Amino acid sequence: MRSGVIAQKVGMTRVFTDAGEHVPVTVLKIDQCQVVAHRTVEKNGYVALQVGVGKAKVKNVSAAERGRFAVAKVEPKKKLAEFRVTEDALIPVGAEITADHFIPGQFVDVTGTTTGKGFAGGIKRWNFGGLRATHGVSISHRSIGSTGGRQDPGKTFKNKKMPGHLGVERVTTQNLRVVRTDPERGLILVEGAVPGVAGGWIQIRDAVKRKLPADVPLPGKFRENGASAPATEAPAAEETA
């Protein structure tokens, strides 16, 4: 079981296959996704990798967190996440996982926070049918109707579907196909929609319900800490500094 990565949702576009068919894809960008720490059975009781992505302002990082980043010899990260892995899939601390960690054609599971919709009624939130348009119904066409019995049971049961806040929930979309990767720009293109808004953080991992292709890199595709980046990445890094 390999590590996943943290990416940022850029938006949606489409790509064309050799047969001329267009495929809708979501563009995900990896921005210096580095391994920050290891979790081991001896010390933590399980095996995992802690990875971080993005650059955080030092003033927004606590002293304890700054110390952990200093031990790992990485810059303070804006977003952290843990991924359970097997012993043979541990990546060295400080290594930067690149976009070609995933290969075209393989399936991945993506996790993100859905777009917030605010307070929503039963029709929008739960796909209720609403009441009749005529025959005595007035004003309450989009109401949810009865929420419980009268004397028996004489209450509304817990978890009854009712109006309320919609969105801002952690959702995992499974079995999305990787269409293309661009290691030089840190881009991963996956087929279909990904939960969340543009700019939101997305976790990408190998699909748990699909067989892993035999040619995926193990433990993963990464650059050692301090290794030189490809020449095409150097100007972009200077511009963002």
From Swiss-Prot:
In the record, N5-methylglutamine modifications are located at 151
Recorded protein name is Large ribosomal subunit protein uL3
According to the record's subunit comment, the protein's assembly and interactions are: Part of the 50S ribosomal subunit. Forms a cluster with proteins L14 and L19.
GO terms (BP aspect): translation
Residues of the region (Disordered) are 140-162, 217-241
MF terms in GO: rRNA binding; structural constituent of ribosome
What does the PTM comment of the record read? Answer: Methylated by PrmB.
Keyword annotations for this protein?
Answer: Methylation, Ribonucleoprotein, Ribosomal protein, RNA-binding, rRNA-binding
Which NCBIfam families did the record assign? L3_bact
* Disulphide connectivity of cysteines: none
Q: Which family does it belong to?
A: Belongs to the universal ribosomal protein uL3 family.
Q: What does this protein do?
A: One of the primary rRNA binding proteins, it binds directly near the 3'-end of the 23S rRNA, where it nucleates assembly of the 50S subunit.
Q: Gene that codes for this?
A: rplC
What organism does this protein naturally occur in? Methylobacterium radiotolerans (strain ATCC 27329 / DSM 1819 / JCM 2831 / NBRC 15690 / NCIMB 10815 / 0-1)
User: Which lineage?
Assistant: Bacteria, Pseudomonadati, Pseudomonadota, Alphaproteobacteria, Hyphomicrobiales
Taxonomic superkingdom: Bacteria
**PANTHER family, per database record:** 50S RIBOSOMAL PROTEIN L3 (PTHR11229), LARGE RIBOSOMAL SUBUNIT PROTEIN UL3C (PTHR11229:SF16)
What segments bear the compositional bias annotation Low complexity?
229-241
Gene3D superfamilies per record: 3.30.160.810, Translation factors
**Cellular component GO terms held in the UniProt record:** cytosolic large ribosomal subunit
